[in-house]
């Protein structure tokens, strides 16, 4: 049975696992350890979160199959584009044979043998948010919405819409930029703003 996870929960877990001691290991999904290090490959990061690893995981649970990075972007994502200015919080970012999670604020969490050899934060080249965290930069080819993630958390978006009405995000282009930088889809938020103002 397909069980969606809220985008904020998904991103929070990805950022939390980046803080734990990890090593990159092909074919693992946070289901094994090497000493204190949790082992994980790139698609295993996404699957591991969705399957409940490393703590109470169950292989292929929650309607999420065991697929690789290329299958994940081609068969398990919607709205796939090569335009990185369209990045939204919780989207998968992909290049041939590799995948990561865009967490908003110019941060991707990915598991890679490159740079830090494990789960790490990087910057997606072409992102509309500046690399203010001075992260290693990777050029991704595509991004898309994972079908296992609930990107429409109405209560969260309703609060954001209320904050927009109060002026927290500015007006005009500044509002669009600020919402995008915060990882929200401007059009979705604006629809809720319009409905609240009726």
Language model regions located:
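Repeat-associated, polar segments at repeat-unit boundaries in modular proteins
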Residues: 182-198
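Loop/turn positions that initiate beta-strands
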Residues: 89-91
């Amino acid at each position: 049975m397909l069980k969606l996870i809220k985008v904020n929960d998904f991103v929070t877990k990805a950022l939390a696992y980046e803080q734990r001691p990890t090593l990159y290991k092909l074919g693992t999904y946070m289901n094994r350890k090497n000493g204190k290090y949790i082992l994980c490959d790139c698609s295993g990061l996404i699957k591991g979160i969705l399957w409940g690893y490393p703590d109470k995981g169950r292989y292929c649970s929650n309607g999420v199959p065991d697929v690789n990075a290329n299958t994940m972007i081609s068969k398990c994502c919607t709205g796939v584009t090569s335009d990185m200015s369209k990045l939204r919080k919780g989207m998968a970012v992909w290049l041939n044979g590799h995948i990561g999670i865009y967490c908003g604020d110019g941060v991707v969490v990915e598991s890679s043998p490159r740079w830090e050899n494990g789960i790490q934060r990087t910057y997606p080249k072409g992102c509309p948010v500046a690399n203010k965290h001075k992260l290693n930069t990777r050029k991704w080819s595509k991004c898309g919405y994972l079908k296992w993630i609930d990107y429409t958390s109405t209560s969260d978006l309703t609060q954001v819409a209320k904050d927009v009405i109060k002026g927290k995000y500015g007006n005009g282009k500044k509002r669009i930029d600020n919402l995008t930088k915060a990882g929200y889809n401007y059009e979705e938020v604006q629809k809720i703003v319009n409905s609240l103002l009726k």
